[in-house]
């Protein structure tokens, strides 16, 4: 899910270092559910029934086939527009990853720091500083304001940051803009997986959760396609950054019509609003049971919204925080950003000299893997996908090590390197990317979910920065083969960790998972 190359810079021939008005509570719940009513009515129309028939000379009736056999499973459709709006934040995340891939050279030339690799790296990496701060403050803010309002508040730095960057005429201005964008991304990337896990019906929570990864992939691909004219127009980067403000407006507007999390509504005592959301998203038959489960969890853990950071040191929260932080450390140290960076040089060796074209191949592979994950995650489960993903990444790394470290025909070596790179990206996208961000809120308690996700993502950003900081030094000192072998070894370690410490959450409601953790500190 979370792929970014925020420190390393690629050049073809070298490596270098709003304000919104809010309707009344119940009125909003009814208005926001208009999406859901439309899609639920469409779902009913899709049902196909069959009639029993009997020929005059038949001795036996042909039994009618139950309608369910032919019914399309569209139970996810009511929640889809709401979680799609939230996933616009991931589209922005992906867009801002890709938007600096090529134009950084033109930006440096126009703003007067061309050739200074430290300043070029700072323009790219200050994004991480903002994202780190955003991830820390996201949890307390969502506890206080709810998901919809927090989303909308933090579209402000996303929009302002893009506009400030687009109009920048000095290094300070571009740094300010990039920091603001990072701040907004840091908050929203924490909110999206939590929002989806709390709004989506249990049966479809995994498939809808992969929209985070899909949104990121689409954002990267769109930014790469939009960046093609930048090769001929040195000022095109301003247009690209102006365009970056538009999804922020769409996110803010869309959240005005999206539903609030029913679990958050219950926490703050808005039971009537929560029932309206559940009825329209999950179905009328789920209302009483869902509210009963919510209240049961609150009775066990307390309904006080102001959970403290120190609570993450107590069981079972400490175990979930440990799993969340460890999964993100392993994800980043398995080398996703290093592989993405070096993939441009790998493609260049086989004649694909355009960095944008090489990145597009990688982006499409990433997108294909995310689509496969959306199909498999609620069938095979989170744990199997996570383990299989890391095993696939390990095999891919060792294949590249073999290709670059052993005396092979040059064409064969290059072909194996390309194959290994694409296999690695696909394997990442099918498990390590989407599952990591999804399983952490699923395991977290309702009381501490925001803070655990904030902690986990802050670890993600620190790990991301460290990998980006040292990757090129390690490659220059030890060679690509050694570094990639270490990535493969970390991938094997991540597969073992996933087997030993993660638990399967497929098909379980968040309340069932939380009660199991509270009662046994484990899930069998």
UniProtKB/Swiss-Prot annotation:
Superkingdom to which the source organism belongs: Eukaryota
Signal peptide stretch: none
Family: Belongs to the major facilitator superfamily. Sugar transporter (TC 2.A.1.1) family.
Membrane topology designation: Multi-pass membrane protein
Claim: Chloroplast is one of the keywords in the record: yes
GO molecular function: transmembrane transporter activity
Name of this protein: Probable plastidic glucose transporter 1
Record key words, sorted: Chloroplast, Membrane, Plastid, Sugar transport, Transmembrane, Transmembrane helix, Transport
Listed InterPro entries: GLUT, MFS_dom, MFS_sugar_transport-like, MFS_trans_sf, Sugar/inositol_transpt, Sugar_transporter_CS
Subcellular location: Plastid, Chloroplast membrane
Function according to Swiss-Prot or TrEMBL: May be involved in the efflux of glucose towards the cytosol.
Record-annotated membrane-spanning stretches: 88-108, 122-142, 151-171, 179-199, 208-228, 239-259, 320-340, 357-377, 386-406, 420-440, 452-472, 483-503
Matches recorded under CDD domains: MFS_GLUT_like
GO terms for cellular component: chloroplast membrane
């Amino acid at each position: 899910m979370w792929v970014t190359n925020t420190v390393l810079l690629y050049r073809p021939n070298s490596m270098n270092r709003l304000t919104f008005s809010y309707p009344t509570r119940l009125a909003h719940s009814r208005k926001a559910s208009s999406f859901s009513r439309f899609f639920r009515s469409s779902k009913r129309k899709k049902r196909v029934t069959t009639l029993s028939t009997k020929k005059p000379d038949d001795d036996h009736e042909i039994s009618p086939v139950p309608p369910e056999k032919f019914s399309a499973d569209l139970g996810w459709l009511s929640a889809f527009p709401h979680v799609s709006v939230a996933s616009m934040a991931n589209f922005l995340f992906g867009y801002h990853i890709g938007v600096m891939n090529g134009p950084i050279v033109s930006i440096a030339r126009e703003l007067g720091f061309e050739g200074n690799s430290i300043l070029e790296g700072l323009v790219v990496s200050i994004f991480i500083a903002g994202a780190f701060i955003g991830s820390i403050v996201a949890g307390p803010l969502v506890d206080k304001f709810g998901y919809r309002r927090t989303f909308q508040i933090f579209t402000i730095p996303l929009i302002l940051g893009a506009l400030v960057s687009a109009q920048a005429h000095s290094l300070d201005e571009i740094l300010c803009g990039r920091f603001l964008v990072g701040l907004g991304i840091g908050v929203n990337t924490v909110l999206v997986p939590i929002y989806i896990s709390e709004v989506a019906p249990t049966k479809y929570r995994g498939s809808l959760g992969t929209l985070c990864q899909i949104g990121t992939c689409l954002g990267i691909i769109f930014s790469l396609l939009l960046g093609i004219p930048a090769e001929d127009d040195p000022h095109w980067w301003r247009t690209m950054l102006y365009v970056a403000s538009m999804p922020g407006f769409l996110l803010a507007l869309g959240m005005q019509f999206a539903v609030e999390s029913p679990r958050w509504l219950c926490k703050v005592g808005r039971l009537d609003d929560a029932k309206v959301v559940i009825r329209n998203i999950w179905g009328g038959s789920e209302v009483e049971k869902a509210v009963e489960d919510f209240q049961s969890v609150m009775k066990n853990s307390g309904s006080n919204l102001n959970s403290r950071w120190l609570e993450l040191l107590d069981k079972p929260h400490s175990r979930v925080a440990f799993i969340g932080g460890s999964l993100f450390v392993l994800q980043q140290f398995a080398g996703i950003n290093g592989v993405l960076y070096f993939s441009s040089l790998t493609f260049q060796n086989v004649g694909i000299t355009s960095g944008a074209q090489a990145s597009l191949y990688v982006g499409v592979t990433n997108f294909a893997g995310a689509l496969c994950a959306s199909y498999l995650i609620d069938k095979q489960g989170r744990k199997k996908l996570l383990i299989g993903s890391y095993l696939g990444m390990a095999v891919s790394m060792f294949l590249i090590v073999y290709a670059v470290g052993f005396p092979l025909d040059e064409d064969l070596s290059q072909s194996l390197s390309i194959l290994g790179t694409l296999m690695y990206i696909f394997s990442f996208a099918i498990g390590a990317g989407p599952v990591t961000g999804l399983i952490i809120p699923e395991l977290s308690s309702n009381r501490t979910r925001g803070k655990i996700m904030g902690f986990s993502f802050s670890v993600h950003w620190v790990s991301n920065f460290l990998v980006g900081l040292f990757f090129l030094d390690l490659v220059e000192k030890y060679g690509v083969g050694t570094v990639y072998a270490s990535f493969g070894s970390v991938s094997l370690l991540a597969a073992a960790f996933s087997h030993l410490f993660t638990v399967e959450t497929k098909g379980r409601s968040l309340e069932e998972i939380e009660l199991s953790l509270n009662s046994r500190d484990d899930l069998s």
